[in-house]
Amino acid sequence: MRWRLSKPQAATSIEQSKGSFEDAIRRNLLFAQLQDLVAWGRKNSLWPYNFGLSCCYVEMVTSFTSKYDIARFGAEVIRATPREADLMVISGTVFIKMAPVIKRLYEQMMEPRWVISMGSCANSGGMYDIYSVVQGVDKFLPVDVYVPGCPPRPDAFLEGLLLLQEAIGKEQRPLSWAIGPQGVERAPKPSLRDQRRAERQKATVFRSPDEV
């Protein structure tokens, strides 16, 4: 595919096409299935809810800075209300007193909506195996992506975001109520830990934590 640049002064002049009609159509038209086009728009325009619980939230917010630039992935539009968001990142320790609030906020989010569990505390309770902490946010919320770490680096959060976008792009959701009742077909969720186990077992050079 070739593109031509012209000066602003010559914008009024129409350049004669030097290719065939098929080439002109190929440069100006895009053909796709409606379902694939909608999924492409959803995965590239996630609106996170500005919500955090504890220290992992600091790492999440760091991903919005210029160094990591989450805007590259179309997820920089932070919403201050759950009614305008479609992504909730559970970043931090989930206390039992906070669980009903989190569930209520989740219910107010737009459909379709997704959840990222960020950090060991949100994934499994972390080091707080006590009566006041929920041992995993998936006890009361459906989780789409788990990001391990205590706390995870912004790079890990961005990788989790990319995994979520990949899964959203493969989802098949109903486009109209007039077609009839339809379910949501989700892509399988592979475990990256299992996929990378063989590669990690072959590692012979181990870097210090300040070099990771």
Swiss-Prot record:
Any one GO BP annotation for this protein: aerobic respiration
Molecular function terms, GO-annotated: 4 iron, 4 sulfur cluster binding; iron ion binding; NADH dehydrogenase (ubiquinone) activity; NADH:ubiquinone reductase (non-electrogenic) activity; quinone binding
Record keyword Oxidoreductase present: no
Membrane topology: Peripheral membrane protein
Primary location group: membrane
Localization per Swiss-Prot or TrEMBL: Cell inner membrane
Binding positions for [4Fe-4S] cluster per the UniProt entry: 55-56, 121, 150
Cofactor note: Binds 1 [4Fe-4S] cluster.
Gene3D superfamilies: 3.40.50.12280
Cofactors, names only: [4Fe-4S] cluster
Keywords: 4Fe-4S, Cell inner membrane, Cell membrane, Iron, Iron-sulfur, Membrane, Metal-binding, NAD, Quinone, Translocase, Transport, Ubiquinone
Organism domain of life: Bacteria
Region (Disordered): 179-212
Record field: catalytic activity: a quinone + NADH + 5 H(+)(in) = a quinol + NAD(+) + 4 H(+)(out)
HAMAP family, alphabetized: NDH1_NuoB (MF_01356)
Function: NDH-1 shuttles electrons from NADH, via FMN and iron-sulfur (Fe-S) centers, to quinones in the respiratory chain. The immediate electron acceptor for the enzyme in this species is believed to be ubiquinone. Couples the redox reaction to proton translocation (for every two electrons transferred, four hydrogen ions are translocated across the cytoplasmic membrane), and thus conserves the redox energy in a proton gradient.
PANTHER family with a match to the protein in the record: NADH DEHYDROGENASE, NADH DEHYDROGENASE [UBIQUINONE] IRON-SULFUR PROTEIN 7, MITOCHONDRIAL
The protein's assembly and partners: NDH-1 is composed of 14 different subunits. Subunits NuoB, C, D, E, F, and G constitute the peripheral sector of the complex.
Protein name: NADH-quinone oxidoreductase subunit B 1
Source organism per UniProt: Nitrosococcus oceani (strain ATCC 19707 / BCRC 17464 / JCM 30415 / NCIMB 11848 / C-107)
